[in-house]
Design a protein with these regions (language model features):
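Secretory/organelle targeting and membrane-embedding segments
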Residues: 1-196
Length: 196
């Protein structure tokens, strides 16, 4: 219901949305408790059997960063970090912030590589997938008239303005540890500068 409501004002084909929503399943469990992973493992197995799905699973950790070590550890303890078939695979996606310092990032990286192969680990920042960032790439590289001129010889300066209509909302705990400067400037805005 929440997904459908959030897409209410978007241009979404109802047939495609219904087809997608039939494949969305929700399972609430305490990710700090190993028993929850048994429930998740059983649910995945059940869905794979019922819908004849391949043994290809992505774990997307859209969680507070403090959980980035515990969740993969629990997945491993429950045998969920390795595929159960020859043609299967497992992937884990971790959103930034990837540690709070070089040392903590290296520690987290070492921990993840102990549980998953490097090729199975994806470290991402959702910001580059946003429409504005994608439009910069399209505007620059898809327009043959601009691409050869888009360099220091023809551009005096680049100004990037970050305007958000969201407040802290429920992200207070995140900003207490990560900080708005680290989240917005050091990550998102520097990424936009790199695109230009």
């Amino acid at each position: 219901v929440h997904i459908r409501e959030s897409l209410k004002n978007k241009e979404v084909d109802d047939v495609e949305l219904d087809s997608f929503l039939r494949r969305v399943f929700y399972l609430a469990f305490d990710s700090t408790n190993s028993a929850g992973y048994h429930k998740l493992k059983d649910r995945i197995h059940q869905l794979r059997q019922e819908q004849q799905l391949p043994d290809k699973i992505i774990y997307y950790l859209a969680t507070p960063p403090v959980m980035y070590e515990l969740i993969p550890t629990c997945l491993k303890e429950n045998g969920m970090n390795v595929a159960g078939s020859e043609d299967g695979w497992r992937r884990v996606i971790v959103e930034k912030p990837f540690g709070t310092s070089l040392e903590s990032a290296e520690r987290l990286n070492k921990h993840l590589i102990h549980i998953f192969d490097e090729k199975e680990i994806y470290r991402i920042d959702h910001f580059l997938g946003k429409e504005t960032a994608q439009n910069v790439l399209a505007f620059r590289f898809a327009n043959g008239i601009f691409e050869p001129l888009w360099n220091r010889n023809y551009i005096d300066y680049v100004e990037i303005t970050a305007v958000e209509n969201l407040g802290i909302e429920q992200r207070g705990g995140f900003y207490e540890t990560a900080g708005a400067l680290r989240d917005m400037v050091q990550n998102h805005l520097i990424q936009l500068v790199a695109l230009t």
